[in-house]
Amino acid sequence: MTDDLEPTAPAAAAPEPEVKGIDLARRALEEARAAAKASGKSVGQGRRSGTGVRALRARRRRGWSGPGPDDRDPQPFGALTNAIAKQRGWSPKVSEGTVLGRWVQVVGEDIAAHAEPTGLRDGILSVSAESTAWATQLRMMQSQILAKIAAAVGDGVVKSLRITGPTAPSWRKGERHIRGRGPRDTYG
Protein backbone atom coordinates (compact mmCIF):
# COMPACT_ATOMS: atom_id res chain seq x y z
CA MET A 1 0.00 0.00 0.00
CA THR A 2 1.24 3.30 -0.89
CA ASP A 3 0.34 6.56 0.49
CA ASP A 4 -1.82 8.18 -2.02
CA LEU A 5 -2.33 11.14 0.20
CA GLU A 6 -0.76 14.23 -1.03
CA PRO A 7 1.44 16.00 1.38
CA THR A 8 -0.53 18.93 2.60
CA ALA A 9 0.85 22.31 3.40
CA PRO A 10 1.67 22.82 7.03
CA ALA A 11 -1.38 23.83 8.89
CA ALA A 12 -1.67 27.52 9.35
CA ALA A 13 -0.83 28.61 12.83
CA ALA A 14 -3.92 28.78 14.92
CA PRO A 15 -4.86 32.36 15.70
CA GLU A 16 -3.89 33.39 19.22
CA PRO A 17 -6.76 33.96 21.55
CA GLU A 18 -7.37 37.63 22.33
CA VAL A 19 -5.31 38.72 25.31
CA LYS A 20 -7.00 40.96 27.86
CA GLY A 21 -6.38 42.56 31.20
CA ILE A 22 -3.29 41.67 33.19
CA ASP A 23 -2.00 39.29 30.49
CA LEU A 24 -2.00 42.14 27.98
CA ALA A 25 -0.09 44.34 30.43
CA ARG A 26 2.46 41.58 31.06
CA ARG A 27 3.00 41.03 27.36
CA ALA A 28 3.47 44.78 26.77
CA LEU A 29 5.99 44.94 29.62
CA GLU A 30 7.91 41.95 28.28
CA GLU A 31 8.01 43.51 24.81
CA ALA A 32 9.23 46.83 26.23
CA ARG A 33 11.95 45.08 28.23
CA ALA A 34 13.03 43.08 25.18
CA ALA A 35 13.21 46.25 23.09
CA ALA A 36 15.24 48.02 25.78
CA LYS A 37 17.59 45.06 26.10
CA ALA A 38 18.03 44.90 22.31
CA SER A 39 18.99 48.58 22.19
CA GLY A 40 21.57 48.05 24.94
CA LYS A 41 19.76 49.85 27.72
CA SER A 42 19.51 48.69 31.29
CA VAL A 43 16.36 46.68 31.78
CA GLY A 44 14.36 47.56 34.87
CA GLN A 45 12.98 44.86 37.07
CA GLY A 46 10.15 46.81 38.61
CA ARG A 47 10.14 48.30 42.07
CA ARG A 48 12.81 47.05 44.40
CA SER A 49 12.30 49.73 47.04
CA GLY A 50 10.45 47.51 49.44
CA THR A 51 7.23 49.48 49.79
CA GLY A 52 4.68 47.05 48.35
CA VAL A 53 2.70 44.19 49.77
CA ARG A 54 5.38 41.68 48.73
CA ALA A 55 8.05 43.60 50.61
CA LEU A 56 5.82 43.75 53.67
CA ARG A 57 5.26 40.00 53.55
CA ALA A 58 8.99 39.41 53.06
CA ARG A 59 9.73 41.56 56.12
CA ARG A 60 7.25 39.58 58.18
CA ARG A 61 8.90 36.34 57.11
CA ARG A 62 12.32 37.73 57.96
CA GLY A 63 11.72 37.40 61.70
CA TRP A 64 13.28 39.42 64.47
CA SER A 65 15.26 42.51 63.58
CA GLY A 66 18.09 41.84 65.98
CA PRO A 67 19.88 44.15 68.38
CA GLY A 68 20.56 46.96 65.88
CA PRO A 69 18.18 49.67 64.72
CA ASP A 70 15.74 48.70 62.00
CA ASP A 71 13.21 50.55 59.87
CA ARG A 72 10.48 48.57 61.64
CA ASP A 73 11.42 49.98 65.04
CA PRO A 74 9.15 52.68 66.49
CA GLN A 75 10.25 56.09 65.23
CA PRO A 76 10.06 59.32 67.24
CA PHE A 77 7.03 61.43 66.36
CA GLY A 78 9.26 64.50 65.95
CA ALA A 79 11.27 62.77 63.22
CA LEU A 80 8.08 62.01 61.34
CA THR A 81 6.80 65.59 61.59
CA ASN A 82 10.19 66.98 60.52
CA ALA A 83 10.18 64.72 57.47
CA ILE A 84 6.67 65.84 56.52
CA ALA A 85 7.58 69.51 57.03
CA LYS A 86 10.64 69.18 54.77
CA GLN A 87 8.69 67.26 52.16
CA ARG A 88 5.95 69.91 51.97
CA GLY A 89 8.23 72.94 52.28
CA TRP A 90 7.06 73.99 55.72
CA SER A 91 10.51 74.03 57.31
CA PRO A 92 10.96 77.84 57.48
CA LYS A 93 7.57 78.32 59.17
CA VAL A 94 8.24 75.46 61.58
CA SER A 95 11.60 77.01 62.50
CA GLU A 96 9.95 80.37 63.16
CA GLY A 97 7.33 78.68 65.31
CA THR A 98 10.07 76.88 67.22
CA VAL A 99 11.74 80.16 68.15
CA LEU A 100 8.49 81.65 69.44
CA GLY A 101 7.00 78.50 70.97
CA ARG A 102 10.11 77.10 72.65
CA TRP A 103 11.63 80.41 73.73
CA VAL A 104 12.62 79.13 77.19
CA GLN A 105 14.50 76.11 75.80
CA VAL A 106 16.12 78.12 72.99
CA VAL A 107 17.57 81.04 74.99
CA GLY A 108 17.59 79.65 78.51
CA GLU A 109 15.54 80.29 81.64
CA ASP A 110 17.52 83.37 82.73
CA ILE A 111 16.80 85.39 79.61
CA ALA A 112 13.28 84.01 79.17
CA ALA A 113 12.34 85.11 82.70
CA HIS A 114 12.97 88.76 81.77
CA ALA A 115 12.19 88.91 78.04
CA GLU A 116 9.64 87.44 75.68
CA PRO A 117 9.45 87.32 71.89
CA THR A 118 6.62 89.34 70.39
CA GLY A 119 7.00 88.55 66.70
CA LEU A 120 9.23 87.36 63.88
CA ARG A 121 9.02 89.02 60.49
CA ASP A 122 11.55 88.88 57.63
CA GLY A 123 14.24 87.42 59.89
CA ILE A 124 13.91 90.17 62.53
CA LEU A 125 12.86 88.89 65.94
CA SER A 126 11.12 91.46 68.14
CA VAL A 127 11.83 90.93 71.83
CA SER A 128 10.16 92.84 74.67
CA ALA A 129 12.18 93.16 77.89
CA GLU A 130 10.55 93.66 81.29
CA SER A 131 12.72 96.67 82.20
CA THR A 132 15.01 99.19 80.57
CA ALA A 133 17.99 97.61 82.34
CA TRP A 134 17.18 94.20 80.86
CA ALA A 135 16.67 95.73 77.42
CA THR A 136 20.17 97.22 77.63
CA GLN A 137 21.61 93.91 78.87
CA LEU A 138 19.95 91.99 76.02
CA ARG A 139 21.34 94.46 73.47
CA MET A 140 24.83 93.73 74.79
CA MET A 141 24.18 89.97 74.63
CA GLN A 142 22.61 90.14 71.17
CA SER A 143 25.32 88.13 69.37
CA GLN A 144 25.18 85.36 71.99
CA ILE A 145 21.38 85.18 71.76
CA LEU A 146 21.56 84.96 67.97
CA ALA A 147 24.12 82.14 68.28
CA LYS A 148 21.79 80.22 70.65
CA ILE A 149 18.87 80.66 68.26
CA ALA A 150 20.97 79.55 65.27
CA ALA A 151 22.10 76.45 67.18
CA ALA A 152 18.49 75.55 68.04
CA VAL A 153 16.72 76.17 64.72
CA GLY A 154 19.42 76.74 62.11
CA ASP A 155 21.17 79.66 60.46
CA GLY A 156 19.20 82.29 58.61
CA VAL A 157 15.93 81.95 60.51
CA VAL A 158 16.66 84.94 62.77
CA LYS A 159 19.06 87.49 61.27
CA SER A 160 18.75 90.26 63.86
CA LEU A 161 16.97 91.23 67.06
CA ARG A 162 14.84 94.29 67.76
CA ILE A 163 14.87 94.68 71.53
CA THR A 164 12.46 97.08 73.21
CA GLY A 165 11.93 98.00 76.83
CA PRO A 166 8.63 98.51 78.60
CA THR A 167 6.27 101.22 77.35
CA ALA A 168 5.49 104.23 79.53
CA PRO A 169 2.04 104.37 81.13
CA SER A 170 -0.63 106.33 79.30
CA TRP A 171 -3.47 108.31 80.78
CA ARG A 172 -5.28 108.52 77.47
CA LYS A 173 -8.89 107.33 77.74
CA GLY A 174 -10.96 106.42 74.69
CA GLU A 175 -10.21 106.87 71.04
CA ARG A 176 -11.21 110.57 70.85
CA HIS A 177 -9.47 112.94 73.17
CA ILE A 178 -8.22 116.49 73.57
CA ARG A 179 -4.60 117.14 74.24
CA GLY A 180 -4.23 117.94 77.91
CA ARG A 181 -1.73 119.98 79.91
CA GLY A 182 0.60 117.00 80.41
CA PRO A 183 1.09 114.56 83.25
CA ARG A 184 1.84 117.22 85.89
CA ASP A 185 2.93 116.16 89.33
CA THR A 186 0.70 113.12 89.87
CA TYR A 187 3.07 111.19 92.13
CA GLY A 188 2.75 113.35 95.22
Curated annotation (Swiss-Prot):
<feature type="region of interest" description="Disordered">
    <location>
        <begin position="166"/>
        <end position="188"/>
    </location>
</feature>
<dbReference type="InterPro" id="IPR007922">
    <property type="entry name" value="DciA-like"/>
</dbReference>
<feature type="region of interest" description="Disordered">
    <location>
        <begin position="1"/>
        <end position="20"/>
    </location>
</feature>
<dbReference type="Pfam" id="PF05258">
    <property type="entry name" value="DciA"/>
</dbReference>
<comment type="similarity">
    <text>Belongs to the UPF0232 family.</text>
</comment>
<dbReference type="InterPro" id="IPR023007">
    <property type="entry name" value="UPF0232_actinobac"/>
</dbReference>
<feature type="compositionally biased region" description="Low complexity">
    <location>
        <begin position="7"/>
        <end position="16"/>
    </location>
</feature>
<protein>
    <recommendedName>
        <fullName>UPF0232 protein RHA1_ro03670</fullName>
    </recommendedName>
</protein>
<feature type="region of interest" description="Disordered">
    <location>
        <begin position="31"/>
        <end position="78"/>
    </location>
</feature>
